[in-house]
Amino acid sequence: MIVQRVVLNSRPGKNGNPVAENFRMEEVYLPDNINEGQVQVRTLYLSVDPYMRCRMNEDTGTDYITPWQLSQVVDGGGIGIIEESKHTNLTKGDFVTSFYWPWQTKVILDGNSLEKVDPQLVDGHLSYFLGAIGMPGLTSLIGIQEKGHITAGSNKTMVVSGAAGACGSVAGQIGHLLGCSRVVGICGTHEKCVLLTSELGFDAAINYKKDNVAEQLRESCPAGVDVYFDNVGGNISDTVISQMNENSHIILCGQISQYNKDVPYPPPLSPAIEAIQKERNITRERFLVLNYRDKFEPGILQLSQWFKEGKLKIKETVINGLENMGAAFQSMMTGGNIGKQIVCISEEISL
């Protein structure tokens, strides 16, 4: 059988901006037979995420993520349906997910590398397992629980940067659900600001491309900032940190403004901002969700429950077709998405 796949065509360079042409689609032969322990799956949805930017470099700069190789199939979060199985615990028709799903229309995988998912947890919206009821949702929930130090009724103010993205849009809502009295989002368009306040329950939203961020922050956070969910780093974060209270907390989720630069992760703060951090005893610890695997299952159940109760609103931007993986990645890296950026490869969920 002939199937399509996407491979890494070229590297943008550590300081370059990724473009759709860094990826290319090609055809490849899929064997007709599968071995014991293997399954053949049809890909339904694929995820593009900011962390993937470092996988485009020859060296990712981390010990837990490997680089993609030139002319080799690219991989990431994916979900699909089993068409044929020789694995004892997986049967035809099961829905499965993996963090290392090849960007390919159909693929033969080791059944042990896959996790079965229950469509009822997402009311049939399978792509949500790649977003709010998946790794981005867990990153937001566990990050806030472990590093935010929020308790019900503690009257805290939380600021979220990259607030209309996959993690940010969920993090702000979770802030309220766990007890923050005020949640303020920072994003890059008027449309995103309106969405945050009218649909996702944010108390205020700041457009960093148009507004004076420092001024707007002072206005929308009169009691200062107690918790900062940082998705972007750079100048925006410097502005937020300078308005943070004593003994406040930064949740380091990502630094997308720094991903196209050859700097360590997390990037060091400027001397002036670092002085503020130390003086006010602000915690800024690297957070890696993969270190909290024991909290994944209860976390997914909690996120699913909030979603079903209507307390967690889920937003996603969907592009169709494997041939658009590169365009979807480029768009996500430049803020073209609202909520989770998803690529739909096949919508047919029956066999």
From Swiss-Prot:
Give the superkingdom in one word: Eukaryota
Query: Which positions in this protein are listed as binding NADP(+)?
Result: 165-168, 192, 208, 231, 253-259, 287-289, 337
Q: Where does substrate bind?
A: F99, Y100, L288, V289, L290
Q: Spell out the GO cellular component terms annotated for this protein, sorted alphabetically and separated by semicolons.
A: cytoplasm
**Does Cytoplasm appear among the keywords?**
yes
Catalytic activity annotation = 13,14-dihydro-15-oxo-prostaglandin E2 + NAD(+) = 15-oxoprostaglandin E2 + NADH + H(+); 13,14-dihydro-15-oxo-prostaglandin E2 + NADP(+) = 15-oxoprostaglandin E2 + NADPH + H(+); 13,14-dihydro-15-oxo-PGF2alpha + NADP(+) = 15-oxoprostaglandin F2alpha + NADPH + H(+); 13,14-dihydro-15-oxo-prostaglandin E1 + NADP(+) = 15-oxoprostaglandin E1 + NADPH + H(+)
Pfam families registered for this protein in UniProt: ADH_N_2, ADH_zinc_N
E.C. designation(s): 1.3.1.48
Class in the EC hierarchy, top level? oxidoreductase
CDD domains on file:
PTGR2
- Subcellular location as annotated: Cytoplasm
- InterPro entries found in the cross-reference section: ADH-like_C, ADH_N_2, GroES-like_sf, MDR_fam, NAD(P)-bd_dom_sf, PTGR2
Could you tell me the keywords of this UniProt record? Cytoplasm, Lipid metabolism, NADP, Oxidoreductase
Give the GO terms filed under biological process for this record: prostaglandin metabolic process
The annotated subunit structure for this chain is: Monomer.
Family per UniProt? Belongs to the NADP-dependent oxidoreductase L4BD family.
Per the entry, what this protein does is: Functions as 15-oxo-prostaglandin 13-reductase and acts on 15-keto-PGE1, 15-keto-PGE2, 15-keto-PGE1-alpha and 15-keto-PGE2-alpha with highest activity towards 15-keto-PGE2. Overexpression represses transcriptional activity of PPARG and inhibits adipocyte differentiation.
Q: What is this protein called?
A: Prostaglandin reductase 2
Protein's organism: Pongo abelii (Sumatran orangutan)
Gene responsible for this protein: PTGR2
